Design a protein with these regions (language model features):
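N-terminal secretory signal peptides that target proteins for export/translocation
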Residues: 1-16, 199
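N-terminal secretory targeting modules
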Residues: 3, 22-214, 220-228
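Conserved SGNH/GDSL esterase-like catalytic core that processes O-acyl groups on lipids
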Residues: 50, 66-72, 95, 101-109, ...
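Active-site-proximal beta-strand/loop segments in catalytic clefts of secreted hydrolases
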Residues: 88, 156, 214-217, 248-253, ...
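Surface-exposed acidic, glycine-flexible loop patches that form ligand/cofactor-binding
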Residues: 144, 284-292, 331-332, 425
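Catalytic His-Asp segment of secreted/periplasmic serine-dependent ester chemistry enzymes
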Residues: 254, 260-266, 305, 345-425
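Surface-exposed amphipathic alpha-helices with a cationic face
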Residues: 326-337
Length: 425
C-alpha cells in the first residue's frame, strides 16, 4: 500500500533499551543476509509490459483454429531479464487445449529472430489445458527483453478450437499457419487476422512499476494505422521510460453497462467485442496487473453515445451516474493503494456515429467540470483541452481528427501522449 494512505500515529511508545536495540539490529542484518543469499541477491518483481482486454466473440462470427499455429505480435513497453505469458480461456465453455507455445523477438513482419526463440512451458510441460473460464500463467522464460520490443508469440492449437476469447481490435496483423510451426523462423500464412487470440498479458522480471491505461476505443487505438503502434499508450511508453504501460482500452467500452445490442441491429455482429463494463472489469484489468502502481482513466463517451445507437435507449445515463462510476473507480484504486488520474472526455460534435446531441454535450461538460474541479482524482489529464478545436471547443481539432469527428488520428494520439506529464510517473 502506498505510504500516502498510511495513517499517521501520534501515540508515544516507550523507548527500547540500547542493548535490546543492538540485538534487534543484528538479527535484522543476519536475516537480511540469509534472504539475499537464498535468492542470489535482491529479488526483482514481475511487472506488466503488455496487456490486452479479453472479450467474448460474437456467436455469429466465432473464428475456428484446427491443427494450426496462431502467430501474434505484441509491442512491449518496459524491458526485463525474464518474461512470462498470461493466456486466457475466460469466455470458453470448454477446456482449451494448447499443444505448443514459443516466444521470440521479431526480426521483420512475422519472421522471428531464431537466436531468441524460446519454448514456453507450464509447470514444466510444453502443453497445457486451460479450464473454461480460467487464465493460465506460464513458467518464467529466460529471454532478455529490451524496452519497446516487438515480441512474437506463436500458439499451436492441435484440435478444432473455436476462438471464444480474444481481443477484437488489435490494430496489428497476425497470421494463422497450418500445422505446428510455432518454432519456425518464417511461416506461410493461410489467414491474416487483426485480433489477439487467447493472449492477455506479458510481464517481465525487473524493478519497474506499471501504469494501466483504462479506456475505450480512443485508448484501444481505433482509427490508428495498422502495425504502427500509434495508440496513445504506446507513444506515452516511449516517454515514460522505465515504466510499464499497459493498454487496457477496448473499443465500445462503457463505465456502467455491458454490451447489449438491440435485437436485429448490425451491432449484434460486433458488440461482444466491447467488453464488460469498466466497473465489472476493473479488478481483473487493473488491480490484478503485475506491478501496477498507477491508473489513467479515460471513459464516459460511450455511456453518452451508445444508448439509442448500439444499445437500448433505456440505458441512457445521467451525468451524475457517470460521475458516480468514476468515484467508484477512484475508491477501488485507492483501497488497493494505487494512484489514479482522471482524463477528461474528448469533444465529439458532428461525429458520424450519431453520438452527439445537445443533451449529451451538456453531460460531457458536466462530467469534465467535475473531473477538473472535484479533487477526487489524484491528478487530472485534460485531454479535452488539448484535443478540442480552438474555434469550436465542442469539436475535435481538425488536425487531430481521424475523420469521424470522434476518434483521434495518429497525430492526435501523439498529442494525447504528450499531454501526460511524465513527472507523475
Amino acid at each position: 500500500m502506498s505510504l500516502r494512505y498510511a495513517p499517521l500515529s501520534t501515540t508515544r511508545r516507550p523507548a527500547l533499551a540500547p542493548k535490546l536495540v543492538a540485538v534487534l539490529a543484528a538479527v535484522v542484518v543476519l536475516l537480511s543476509g540469509w534472504a539475499s543469499e537464498a535468492s542470489g541477491g535482491p529479488r526483482a518483481d514481475w511487472v506488466g509490459t503488455w496487456a490486452s482486454v479479453p472479450t467474448a466473440t460474437p456467436a455469429s462470427s466465432t473464428p475456428v483454429v484446427d491443427n494450426e499455429t496462431v502467430r501474434q505480435i505484441v509491442h512491449t513497453s518496459v524491458g526485463g531479464s525474464e518474461l512470462r505469458l498470461r493466456l486466457t480461456n475466460e469466455f470458453g465453455a470448454a477446456p482449451l487445449r494448447i499443444g505448443d507455445v514459443h516466444v521470440a523477438r521479431r526480426a521483420a513482419g512475422t519472421t522471428i529472430d531464431p537466436r531468441t526463440d524460446r519454448q514456453v512451458t507450464f509447470a514444466g510441460s510444453p502443453t497445457v489445458t486451460i479450464p473454461a473460464g480460467a487464465p493460465m500463467l506460464s513458467d518464467p522464460i529466460r529471454l532478455a527483453l529490451p524496452p519497446r520490443t516487438d515480441l512474437v508469440v506463436s500458439i499451436y492449437l492441435p484440435a478444432r478450437t473455436p476462438v471464444t476469447t480474444l481481443h477484437g481490435f488489435a490494430y496489428q496483423e497476425n497470421v494463422i499457419a497450418a500445422g505446428n510451426v510455432a518454432d519456425d523462423r518464417t511461416v506461410t500464412a493461410t489467414r491474416t487476422v487483426t485480433q489477439w487470440f487467447f493472449l492477455s498479458g506479458v510481464s517481465v522480471r525487473g524493478h519497474a512499476q506499471s501504469v494501466v491505461a483504462l479506456g475505450d476505443s480512443i485508448t484501444n487505438g481505433f482509427e490508428t494505422d495498422i502495425n504502427a503502434n500509434h495508440r496513445w499508450p504506446d507513444l506515452f511508453a516511449a516517454r515514460a521510460r522505465g515504466t510499464g504501460v499497459l493498454n487496457l482500452g477496448v473499443a465500445g467500452n462503457r463505465l456502467l453497462h455491458d454490451p447489449n445490442p438491440p435485437p436485429g441491429s448490425d451491432a449484434e455482429g460486433y458488440a461482444a467485442f466491447f467488453g464488460e463494463s469498466a466497473l465489472r472489469r476493473f479488478d481483473r484489468d487493473v488491480l490484478a496487473q503485475p506491478g501496477v502502481s498507477q491508473v489513467i482513466v479515460l471513459l464516459g463517451v460511450n455511456d453518452l453515445g451508445h444508448p439509442g445507437t448500439t444499445a437500448p435507449i433505456e440505458e441512457t445515463v445521467t451525468a451524475e451516474e457517470i460521475i458516480g462510476a468514476h468515484k467508484q473507480l477512484v475508491a477501488r484504486a485507492h483501497a488497493a493503494g494505487l494512484t489514479i488520474h482522471g482524463g477528461t472526455i474528448l469533444p465529439f460534435k458532428g461525429d458520424t456515429l450519431g453520438f452527439y446531441n445537445e443533451a449529451n454535450e451538456a453531460k460531457r461538460r458536466q462530467v469534465n467540470h467535475w473531473i477538473r474541479t472535484s479533487g477526487t482524482y489524484d491528478s487530472v489529464i485534460d485531454f479535452d483541452r488539448v484535443m478540442r478545436d480552438p474555434a469550436d471547443p465542442q469539436r475535435l481539432n481538425p488536425t487531430y481528427d481521424s475523420g469521424d469527428h470522434l476518434h483521434p488520428n495518429d497525430a492526435g494520439m501523439a498529442a494525447m501522449a504528450n499531454a501526460i506529464p511524465t513527472r507523475l510517473f
